């Protein structure tokens, strides 16, 4: 033993005791006594010393002094020990290798000396120090061996999961990088006699047994046990030989698998092992005919995720009218909280796409007979309240599906085709036919107005000006987003309403005809009259001033104490620069162009829905800047027009051919023609722009009925200009900044609350279920809550796997919002008299949310063969 360890051992004893007894029957250290120097310690060689005199000196003469009493023999029996009373309040020092090692480690159990001696080769300086960081005073042979294994494996703790994580990581590195660390670890375990200890530990804790135990075989049994517990219960027989043996072992193994998937540090290792096991086991072959609902908990391999998705796609295609919506939505939510969706965004997007597809199918089922409304006002109201959701669901489905396709996956191809046919061939066709019937019956081309619906051409007078009747309103901001469709604005409004200091309210207005940029932008400006000038093509003039371009619009607005600016220019300004710029103006018009700039170009129109997502983000940021940095309190987000978009390429049937080529054309577009003395056509709406937009001249228009186009130049799938509701139902999203007191009173969307469904929680199996209730449905006032759920003992040790659950049900029936959580206990050492707690932890912040007392009363399951 090195001298410093010897000295350190003595110093450690004197740090806690005044008197230390040192028995050295082999007299190994008799020659070193003379050189032994310990500060403030008196050494007494008891070979010839009078024990009575020493006792007097220690207790009476020098009661504060520290003494080291060295004996050349073993401690005498108590009845012959003159110093017994002193010995009982003192400490003993042992100077053999094992004793000094125990002393260095800070372990007082001298009964471990023989075990330390057997493991003597383990105790290099480096390993001893690493072991010292792990041990406690309460060690036995088993716990000490486990911590030695942890040191050799390179684990930071002696938890079984940490040891396994390190060994598995070394195994994966060996397989993928030809790394030799695992070989070194295994050789070291064998050299120190710890290899059989490792396998016995795994047998005791997980029920793992094998004739020739190995990491490969352990992994096989872990994955098979995981599959057997989570997958279709009717398809377990094929896994039976490789399932771990005991109930407590299986529960511990399942808890390990849950922890493995949850710990992103070991993601690469899990993905590699899962792929290897998937190739070896081919679980998809066994579960191909299983119901996806029987696989709802399973996340063992990626092929299981793919099997579930295939089944859900088939269900949507084959059971679209009989689908159990609640079960379907619940399964989607559950799957999105599982491993493969959390680690591979394209799988999360697949379930988002399925959710929107189901939403679209449900809307179709509710309107299977078409869209028959008695008049235009009723039709308009129906669109604003519900029918716009067809367009929204279609857009969102394609947004997610395109993300999936971009990764090279074709899993949604058949559903893609089905949704496209539903939307384009049924919804748009039915909607346009029924809407056209109402427009024709009411002769709306000659009277372009709908009872109770504001008109876009009156926007400034009816929306902007009245704001100043409130003396507290000093400035109004108007954000005009080119081609912002009503359904996109609705999504924007929902997002804004999640902000505590803002409130958004969506209304609609009837857009001008033809519904295109120049005319729509002009209609939104303050004006008395709009007109075209024959010498300037399709440029619209407001009271004799051109409305084309930001500088001209700024000129018009200056007459009304207003100004115009592009959104990009405004966002580039520093806060004070922005405030200085708008200081002298009451009305600020901000032009934003993302959707139209993308959709109205042939080379980029396929990115229209991507542009909608970008626009929502940009507009929300713009609103936030106006309120927080420019101190805006009244903001209106509106548009010049909406748009029609179909994902599929158009055919010749989508094109209208005019019988006579119009002369005197001012503007020729895919969805409209503006000119003078235009010919009538059976397939077109014909009218005067004076009737539909308040233009003062005699210009006319032709618009294809329904969704057809005149030509496909400049892109054909993205269009506007016509009479379809998607084109002329223009959003007016009013956003208010709330004062502090109002903001505090404003009902804020907050996470749903979760409570235990039963007052007493009792677990009687190593793998058992707990029912939890989501108190409110997700909706306007409540948002989803994601929890980590697990069990701890009274020392706050985690004794189960951590389950990640998303509570996001929007069902209004309480019983439908109950979720069962399967918990896997770690080990079998549970006592019904001990205290345990069910912990509900916020998954994002990892802070406690709720806790409930739990009784664990396991049946006797492991006592016999």
From Swiss-Prot:
Keywords, ordered alphabetically: Antiviral defense
Induction of synthesis: Transcribed at similar levels in lag and exponential phase, rises in stationary phase.
Changes seen on gene knockout: No methylation of 5'-GGTAAG-3' in chromosomal DNA, BREX no longer confers phage resistance.
Keyword Lipid biosynthesis: no
InterPro entries: Alkaline_phosphatase_core_sf, PglZ, PglZ_dom
One Gene Ontology biological process: defense response to virus
Superkingdom to which the source organism belongs: Bacteria
Alphabetized NCBIfam families for the sequence: BREX-1 system phosphatase PglZ type A
Family stated for the protein in its record: Belongs to the alkaline phosphatase superfamily.
Function of the molecule: BREX systems (bacteriophage exclusion) provide immunity against bacteriophage. Part of a type 1 BREX system which protects against dsDNA phage. This system allows phage adsorption but prevents phage DNA replication, without degradation of the phage DNA. Methylation of bacterial DNA by PglX guides self/non-self discrimination.
Name of the protein in its database record: Alkaline phosphatase-like protein BrxZ
Organism taxonomic ancestry: Bacteria, Pseudomonadati, Pseudomonadota, Gammaproteobacteria, Enterobacterales
Gene designation: pglZ
